[in-house]
Curated annotation (Swiss-Prot):
Keywords: Acetylation, Hydrolase, Serine esterase. InterPro entries: AB_hydrolase_fold (IPR029058), Esterase-like (IPR000801), S-formylglutathione_hydrol (IPR014186). The lineage of its organism: Eukaryota, Viridiplantae, Streptophyta, Embryophyta, Tracheophyta. Pfam families: Esterase. This is S-formylglutathione hydrolase. The gene is SFGH. It comes from Arabidopsis thaliana (Mouse-ear cress).
Length: 284
């Protein structure tokens, strides 16, 4: 393994293994952890495609692995699950831990342009550094066959990263994503601090803005949204994204679910549909 990449945890599940790793990120300038579920079929002679999962505010790389139950379907389909952390950690930037929705645990999957937050480059970490690290160190993974998914802030990350990198990912899905961050409080706070006042820069990290430019999609976008989600009306705004998709005939399946909230109970209920969605796009 590359210098500085070390395994820090391993548990068997559905005949595969959850493994956790630590490494020093050149992109972020700090030590980072990430988790991988290796399905039982994964080997150097039978490489597994990769589904990246981007988590939401306050989360680490462990939330999805521990709570979602995605390993059952991933084991069946032969998909590796890769879950990075949600921000740099341990940099001790003044104010980084003052609120749950900004700084530590709230990287918003962008490349910050403001000097104070210059290490917050989760976009480059997810799109460039992490795939390279995986391809160099895990012969049982096929990083050229990849899809991406996420929840809330991570759903925002999955949608924007997918739309800006249609050559790198076969499909995208999201649970309760922040689809129009330039028009919600979470997004406005994060973008103002990370990106400054340049609204054109904001739009590069807004799925509702991006779909008008990047819509030559080979796979339907799948979004699940709980109707009892406390953040649904004011922060997530999926109807705005739906309108933007309709304008350019972008294929979107937006499913609204009565009674479900913003939690991992909701994710666990429908995660199998998402794994199947990606398995189809990855031709498994």
């Amino acid at each position: 393994m590359a210098s500085g990449l070390s395994e820090i945890g391993s548990t068997k599940m559905f005949d595969g293994y959850n493994k956790r790793y630590k490494h020093f990120s050149e992109t972020l300038g700090c030590s980072m952890t990430f988790s991988i579920y290796f399905p039982p079929s994964a080997s150097s002679s039978h490489k597994s495609p990769v589904l990246y999962w981007l988590s939401g505010l306050t989360c680490t790389d462990e939330n999805f692995i521990i709570k979602s139950g995605a390993q059952r379907a991933a084991s069946t389909h032969g998909i590796a699950l890769v879950a990075p952390d949600t921000s740099p950690r341990g940099l001790n930037v003044e104010g980084e831990a003052d609120s749950y929705d900004f700084g530590v645990g709230a990287g918003f999957y962008l490349n910050a342009t403001q000097e104070k937050w210059k290490n917050w480059r989760m976009y480059d970490y997810v799109v460039k550094e992490l795939p390279k690290l995986l391809s160099e160190n895990f012969s049982q993974l096929d990083t050229t066959k990849a899809s991406i998914s996420g929840h809330s802030m991570g759903g925002h990350g999955a949608l924007t990263i997918y739309l800006r990198n249609l050559d790198k990912y076969k499909s995208v899905s999201a649970f309760a994503p922040i689809t129009n961050p330039i028009n919600c409080a979470w997004g406005q706070k994060a973008f103002t601090n990370y990106l400054g006042d340049n609204k054109a820069a904001w739009e590069e990290y807004d799925a509702t803005c991006l779909i008008s430019k990047y819509n030559n999609l080979s796979a339907t976008i799948l979004i699940d949204q709980g109707e009892n989600d406390q953040f649904y009306p004011d922060q997530l705004l999926p109807s705005k994204f739906e309108e933007a998709c309709k304008k350019v005939n972008a294929p979107l399946l937006l499913r609204l679910h009565p009674g479900y909230d913003h939690s991992y109970y909701f994710i666990a209920t429908f995660i199998e549909d998402h794994i199947s969605h990606h398995a189809q796009a990855l031709e498994l």
